[in-house]
Amino acid sequence: MRRFLTGFLCVILALGMAFSAAAEPVRGAVRFSEDGQEQLGQPLAGLKIGIDPGHQTHANTEREAIAPDSSETKAKVASGTAGVNTRTPEYVVDLQVSLILRDILTAMGAEVKMTREENDVDISNIERAVMMNEWGADMVLRIHCNGSIDRSVKGAGMYVRKTGAMAEESAQLARCLLAAVGEYAGAQTQSVYKRDTYTGLNWSEVPCVLVELGYLSNAEEDALLNDAAYQEKLALALVWGMIDYVNTP
């Protein structure tokens, strides 16, 4: 956290520069003081944004329904992956990025709720979704890292529901997030994938995206995802994507 705090002002300044460089500045993002100095506004003021850092220290192999109307079940919380070289568990990286994201969103004026702020918890995927539904979130990001037996595979990807009331809104949010991660974090990107197999997405009653930040099974992305500066870039890019989403007609 100390490393993040030392770089936080730089992140905010970078966001301000990104806004000022845009051909059409995002509504409410930049304002000017009386002496003409550029200042950062709060473009996400009034929004309630949920963050669900994926996984937890210990998996929960008990079963729960993957959707409200389904008899199919999955483990309440899977174990997640780990860095191929760093051996850092996914749940650690998920939380690190989520905490940075929380702080930037708060600075942007959003009200933020996290499903967890520590790793040693036991919160099922249904419980995480219901928590956000009951809180009245305007949108939810589920922060994860990917893994593959093919260590050459890399790239950030977004997962949303294929069907359901929030499917298209979630897909629109996902497209904005994916574009921003590629442009502002410099990440290699994959695509927006539509699935009805993710419990946390199926139980969500608001626009919800499962964000796969990259592949911990890939040596290059393992190193990046464990780098504090890159984590800040990813978090900042996700914020930019959310701002783009809320300003899209």
Predicted features, each with a name:
Residues 1-249:
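Catalytic-site microenvironment of enzymes
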